[in-house]
């Protein structure tokens, strides 16, 4: 970031390049969502072919329950992932504050920060905090398959239940991805609009205002 690195020249003129990068990233996310949706459909078709089921009857209570569970998994996964990001970020904030207190020359450019500790925190925290979302994504279909088999439900019904789960995950996951992509882009653009200056109720609002703080948080 030019502001953090104190780059030469007018920083705000170079924000045009940042806008281009954001546009490219948004376009790339759209392609990623589309490819993930097609991959999910292909896996679902392969699953139906492999199991030999002719259809999924959602009038059956277990299948309908798995459909709802599948719809909830992407939402819960996203919540856990965002919570993990927040926890990792706070650990980084505590480390940066510690370095500011213990190494006074950092702010004046006379002392070198301990970059390795920040990198170590980001790596360890990201791996540790993402364990639960990963277990949720991998373990849920395994549990859905094993428990009915242990109870004594026929394999064909178990296959339909897992198919209902996969259908719920696919539909909910694609819609949730589109929603988050658009919401994230809107929030980012709102923040940048305030940095450039936005007229609200006849008054110009800039960076540092309450409206800008609200858009950031």
Model features per residue range: what roles?
Residues 10, 32, 36-59, 63-217:
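Extended, low-charge hydrophobic alpha-helical regions
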Residues 1-8, 12:
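Single conserved hydrophobic/aromatic residue that forms the stacking wall/gate
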Residues 13-29:
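Interfacial and helix-entry/exit segments of alpha-helical transmembrane bundles
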